[in-house]
Every structure is written in C-alpha cells, then in structure tokens.
Amino acid sequence: MLGLGTITKKVFGTPNDRKVKSVRPLVAKINALEPEFQALDDAGLIAKTEEFKQRIAAGESLDDLLPEAFANAREGARRALGLRAFDTQLMGGIFLHQGNISEMKTGEGKTLVATLPAYLNALTGKGVHIVTVNDYLARRDAEWMGKVYAQLGMTCGVVVPFQQEDEKHAAYAADITYATNNELGFDYLRDNMKSELSQMSQRGHHYAIVDEVDSILIDEARTPLIISGPSQDKSDLYVTIDKVIPELVEEHYTIDEKTRGVSFTDEGNEFLEDRLHALGILPEEQSLYDPESTTIVHHINQGLRAHKLFNKDQQYIVRNGEVVLIDEFTGRMTPGRRLSEGLHQALEAKEGVEIKPENVTLASVTFQNYFRLYDKLGGMTGTAATEAEEFAEIYGLGVVEVPTNRPIQREDEHDQIYRTVQEKFDAIVKTIKEAHAKGQPILVGTTSIEKSEYLSQLLKKEDVPHNVLNARQHEQEAQIVADAGKLGAVTIATNMAGRGTDIQLGGNVEMRVLQALAETPEANPDEIRTRIEAEVAENKRKVLEAGGLFVLATERHESRRIDNQLRGRSGRQGDPGRSAFFLSLEDDLMRIFGSERLDKVLSSLGMKEGEAIVHPWVNKSLEKAQAKVEGRNFDIRKQLLKFDDVMNDQRKTIFSQRMEIMETDDVAEITRDMRHQVINDLVDEFIPPKSYADQWNVEGLYAAILEKVGADTDVIKWAEEEGVDDEIIRERLEKASDEFMAAKAAQFGVENMRRIEKQLLLQTIDQKWREHLLTLEHLRSVVGFRGYAQRDPLNEYKTEGFQLFESMLDSLRVDVTDKLGKIRPLTEEEQQAMMRQIAAQQAAAQAANEAARQPQPAMAGAGAEAEEGTPAEGFVESDPTTWGNPGRNDRCPCGSGKKFKHCHGRYT
C-alpha cells in the first residue's frame, strides 16, 4: 500500500522533478544550436569566445549567453577530446552555473560537466576556480580539460603544493584554475601575510566549482587550515606523561566514543597526583585542581586521548619516523596535517618517534568560511541529497539530483547482519570466493587499514588473488583502481570517496596502452591500442555476463553518504552491478548506537552461529541511527560555525585593512591618525575631561609623549599659560608630533620614510593579529564553562571577542606610533660595525664549511649539507645593492651554500 507522501509525489511531482523540468527548454535551445557551431572551423570557435566577451562587456547577462556558450563549449570538447556532452551533462552544467550542487552518479562525466559553466563564467575575465580533493586530480583534470579550453581560446592553470611563485601567479592569472581545497585556502592565508600587492597570487573569489563538494564542505568543514610557527619545546613533558598513561586502569577514566571525549574519575585523579608528585612534574604542595595545573591536566588528557581514541593503522600510520594522519572519509594519508593542542605530540610520544614542537597559529581559516568568500559557488558529487539541509543553511546552495544518462541497473541488496565479527568475515570470504569463481569483479570496502589487511590475510589463506588499496599503497592507487573492473578481480579498499578514477568493466584501455608502450617502446602504438581495445571489449562482455561489478561493504559508516559513495562505484553508465553490506553487532556503529537490544531480539529468535538476519526493517533502523549521527554532527558543525563567525568577521576586517594599506603608496595619513589617537588617549589619561588645572598631571603627560610618540615637547610650559585648556594642549601636541615626524622623514628621505611606514605598519598588524588569535583560542577553550553560571557561552564569546579585538587595535596604534617615533638612520660608524659583524659571521661560516668538507665518518640518518659555491658575479659584501634580489629560500649570493634567510638575508 502506497503512503500519502508517495501518492502526492506521483500526482504533483517532487521539487527536484520540477527543477529538472525547468531547464529542459534551455537544453533544447543548446541542442538546436549544435549544427551552427559544428559548421564553424577551429578559428571560428575562438572567434565566438571573443564575441561573447565583448557582448558581456556591453552588458549582456551570462544567463542570456548560456545556450550559445554551452553549445560552443560542447563543440570544443567534441573536437579536443572526442567527448560530446549528453543532455543530462548539459543539465548538470546549468545547475552549477545557477549556484547549485549537481548530484550526478559515478560515471556520469562530472569532469566534463564542469567545463561548461567554467567556460561561461570565465568569459567575464574574473577567473574561475575548479576545486578537487587531491593534487593528482587537479593535475589530471587541468591537463585533460585544458585541451578543451585551448580549443576555445581560453587559458587553464593548475595550482599544486611547492610550486614556484611565478608558476603559481601564472596559474591564478589563467581563465580557469584547477586546485585543491587545501592549496586554495593556504594561498588565501599566505596572500594576506604578504607585504606587496605584486606578491599576492589570488586575484579575487568570483566563482568556484567544487568537485566532491560533500567531502570538502561537509566532511572537512570543521578542519581549520592553519599556517603556524614553532613554539616552546615541551617534548620531555610529553614523553614523561606518556609513560604514566599505560599505568592507568579502567576505573581511572571514562571514554565517550560518541563525542570522542575522555575524563578522569576521582580515583584516576588521586592516582595521577601521586604519580606526578613522585616524578617531580607536579610540585608537592600543588593539586591537579589548582589553576597552575591547567597545562599539566591538558597534557594528561591529550595523552589519554592518544592512547584510547587513536588507533595505529586506523586514524594514523607511522611512516619514515613520522605520525601521518589518515583522512577518515577518504582513507588517504594527509602528510603535513597535524592535530592541534598537543594531541599530535602525544601521538608521537606514544609511538616513540621524534616529537616536533607545538606550533603557534599565525593565520587560520576554515573551509566553511573560505568558500563563503566566493560571489558564486557550485558543486558536484554523487551523494549530496542526505545533506541538503546543511548545504542550504550554511552555504545557501540548493541540491538538484540530475537524472542519469541511462537507467541504473545495480541491484542493492538488504544488509546482512551477523552476531560476531568473525562470523561476518567468514561469510565475506565465502561470498568473495563465489564471485571470483564466476569471474565477477568485486570491490570490498573496509573502514580501516587494519581491517583491510586482516581480510587480505584471510583471502591469502584461501588462495584468492587480490589487490589491497589503502593509505600504505596510495602510490599505486590509479593502477589498482584501473584493474578493479577486470574479469575476476578482487580489490580490497579503504574508503573510496574521492578516488577520482572510474572503475571500468573489463579493464582500463588507456592505462593498459601506457603500460604496453612502456614495456615495448619500439612497438606500433596503433596496433597495441587496437589489440588492447579488442581484449578489453571481450573481457567486458564476460564481466557483464557475470553480473558486473559487485561492491561488498564490510561495515556501515556513520554517514549514509559515504555508504552511498561506495555503492555508486558499481552500475556506472547503465551497467549491471550488485551491492551488499555485511555487518555484525560488534561493529563500531552498531556497538555505539544500541546493538544490545538487537542482540537480545536475535537471541530470542533462536539465531544460530553463522546465520545472518536480512530484513528491510533492519535497514530502516540502521538508516535512522545514521541519520541521528548525521543530525548530531550537523548541529556540532553549525554551533562551531557560529563561534568561528566571530573570528571570521574580525579576520575579514583585518585582511581588508591590510589590503587597503598594500594598495596605498603613502600611508602617512594612516600613521598620523594613529599617532593623533594615541595623543588623545594620553591627554584624556593625564588631563581628565572637565578637570581643574591643579588636577592635571602635566609631568606624566610630558614623559608619556616622549616615551610613546618620541617628541620632546613644551607641554609643561603650555600648561602654565593663562586660559589653556585640554583641547589647546591636544592640538599643540598633535602639531608638535607632526613636525617631529616631518623632520624624521627629511632625515631618511621622503620615499624611504613612506616605505618604512608601510612595512612597519604591515608587520605590526601581523604580529598583533597572531597574538590576538592565540588569545581567542584561549578564550574559546574556557568559555564553555560559563554555561554553568547560566550564561550563554556564544554570547559571552562574542562580547569578549569584540572587546579583545578593540583592545588589539588600541595596542596596534600604540606600537606603530612608538616604533616610528624611535627609528633613526644608522650613523656611518654603525653601518661599518654592522658590515664588520657580517664579515666575521661570514668568515666563521666559511671556516665551518671548510671543516665540513674534510672526510668524516658516515653517520646514519645524517641530512644532506648545503652546497657551497663561488659568490655571484658583482657581489660586494659591504654593499647590499650588489646582492641582487634573492628570495628568502634561495641560495645566498655570497656563495656560502646557505639559504638567503639564514645568511645575508638576516641583515637586510
């Protein structure tokens, strides 16, 4: 019997159906234009691009231009790649242009879809960013789709880590730029730490298309991008505390797996106090409850979390003596990403590797706030519908499910639930053997490296050939995925989200052709391609007969979306396929979210060992549990965003102020206003408003002006004059300070003084912002306790955060005024002394290098030393103008072999 909702949808259609229907006339227009654009020669396509640009400049809207631009882009792709966009791909492109998320199933050609709205929006000349989840995909898509843009007379660039600055500038200057979400965010932060406009890479945030948008804007939403610098080394403390943690017993602590939190019981606190007193970490008279113990308690908590909540080969792996985190959503290693607040150091102590110092935040931004900078945003994914509410509420993005080009023929089976993990794995191995025997390729999804390797051992015992794809094998990722659709292939993989390479039934022709040419370079490429295409076609026929790709998941993820992504690997482009989930009551999701009740029910049903329960009701109850988790995670992200918005508003204010300063050649007016404000504050402090002259502290005002402004004034004499009030003194002090700074500018030269003011202003802003970020972090960590006093932590954070921001601006004015008042040109003697110091240090460095070149016994793990060379042509040590303009990380022109920043760069 159909429910009322189902009947209503059948009669009136769903909102999604209506959206799809609304763009069909546009698709018809594009199709009608196809013959006209096919008739153009290659130069004609480029001429159309120029024509479109002129029409936009004349005021025509992108929406009006869409049918022609899409028709031109479709024809460009057909000629460049031999790929013609289907009607469903045109729909996906239209929804992206309108600022929606296009939900398109695996194999529907999302990479090609992005070229359509990217081309249209790039016609404005403002640049378009296409965002991918990893560097491999950014490079691949830029190279592949770059041919389409070139066919249309557009430029395409790619941004990757460790790129030369000139390459990065060129990539961002291109019409369409491919980049990862991480690199875009970090470049935004780096740009806002630069001191010259010409050094900045990004040229604004006009339009972005985010591939795997759910992964980036939902899964990664809480991940802050942080540029940091080293702080005080506390490695001994981490090591000592790490030795104490294994001594704890279960009665000493509690763990909440749902919130991933830990806390100590009273027994645990007593035990720790005794141990820490004995180790000398906690002074005898000091308790763990004392305010002075906050840091130690924090370290102990992080040590416990490292041991009890973070498992090796699940949340992280140890590689080359480093703890490398694993992305729980994609199964990839994330080198360079570190846990904050000492947790990463606690993991390093646990694993006995080198403990790197904690870092101080220099600049940070979350993906939520970075991507909200764009004027327009679009996204693509195979699975977004389950998170539609979050996309709409946080980012203002609608989700549209785009119909597949061909109907999906995949058979999604009901979950099979076993009582124990061992029973589940026995059933999985049996199912894999059956599928392998009939030649059906099978993709087995696991949630951790540990489980993927355990299953691999079971299959080895049964002599089943297979491949394993997890964070350890990420270098062979493309090859393993390309082989996963071969006849009888068995592939065990951790999460497949964002893998980027489609699993093609029968094998991947392009990958096999490349392999064959690498093995026999002298062979005829055309003959090899013809032979391989025939072999793959025959294999595909056999695979289809065997039932297509079988996706077998060994566990449910917290998010339905991740499960759907794994399922979506099968049944691409109308191919047959099959998917099934094998679960046990001991799985994390089942255990944490109430498997005890289900276990009792199954026991009462008389379930025998090795038997599975399969029923749609079980599926529904599991999906409800997942929906609860998703809802809770959404609430957490929403609350965190409210807190982050406080910092984000301040960040935007500071960054826009920096930009204004960089765009201004002469900042004298800004520094003068700061100086006058400092003087006003000092006058108010020492000559209170509406006070009598005998209440004035004129001597204090004189000393404060001399110290903080640098000007030696006659304020004591002025105060003795008849009829003088605080306003007259204020005006005279401002005038005296202006004359003082004008005389200083004459000493330096006006141009030099302007440059000094600008650099000093930017440096001080950066320093104050860093200090402010640290203060906000501390406030954020304690403000939650205000809830116990019936005060709203968010409102408290907003109020105090604003007060701290105002205080930072006051401090900024005082510091800039103070520094400008104290600077002076070096005397000739001081310049000579500085040059002598440089020469002495240079001689010492050269002597050290000479000693280093003598034969030395080999040392295990010794790093490569810097290469020494001869000084650059024209280099004169005492004349910095002959040093050229090396970058901070370039070799020093003196020939020492050191980086410039560690050599002569220290004196510039």
UniProtKB/Swiss-Prot annotation:
CDD domains: DEXDc_SecA (cd17928), SF2_C_secA (cd18803). ATP binds at Q89, G107, E108, G109, K110, T111, D502. Residues 848-864 have a biased composition (Low complexity). Keywords: ATP-binding, Cell inner membrane, Cell membrane, Cytoplasm, Membrane, Metal-binding, Nucleotide-binding, Protein transport, Translocase, Translocation, Transport, Zinc. May bind 1 zinc ion per subunit. Its cofactor is Zn(2+). Zn(2+) binds at C892, C894, C903, H904. Monomer and homodimer. Part of the essential Sec protein translocation apparatus which comprises SecA, SecYEG and auxiliary proteins SecDF-YajC and YidC. This is Protein translocase subunit SecA. It comes from Dinoroseobacter shibae (strain DSM 16493 / NCIMB 14021 / DFL 12). The lineage of its organism: Bacteria, Pseudomonadati, Pseudomonadota, Alphaproteobacteria, Rhodobacterales.
